[in-house]
Amino acid sequence: DIGTGTGLIALMAAQSNAQARIDALEIEPAACREAAYNIRISPWAERIRLYPQALQAFFPAIGYDCILCNPPFFVHSTPAPDNGRSLARHTGTLPHTELIVHAERLLTPHGKFQVILPVEEACQLIAYARRYHLFPRKITRVHPNPGKAPKRLLIQLTRQTLPPVETDLTVELSRHHYSEEYIALTREFYLKME
């Protein structure tokens, strides 16, 4: 999990796959402390290792079958005055181009790189990934509600050059009324999801 923040995605991955061993990277000290705490109190602590370092300095002895990332979204905007928030939201310390370079370096031959981005940034990332022989295998367009344009793309990149499987996911049918598909996808992660 690249840029784990408070560890949420790493914890969700551990909860979803009982065999998974997860390495989580985070460079922001306060977020790293919170991730360490969240991991420590979870039932999956023995399967998650937290590395307080940048992706660019991470050179494990193994490759990864799956790399997850919810990267900083904002490319050309004013950073937040709070440095921690800025690191989490802006691409200054991890441009999407570097994300691709390092994901390609860390993936096993049949590995998958899964990322969520706003539509425009996702399209740019897909185009750049092709230079590193990573191709979209799955693309899910995430719509906030019916009739609205997608706000995010969930992308799975692999070394396979097959045509991507494309799907749509609508989050809410109306305010706080979640779609059945979204409920089915997220139910195990919420205390109350209806």
Question: Which ranges hold each PLM region?
Answer:
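Conserved Class I SAM-dependent methyltransferase catalytic core
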Residues: 94-150
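SAM/dcSAM-binding transferase cores
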Residues: 148-194
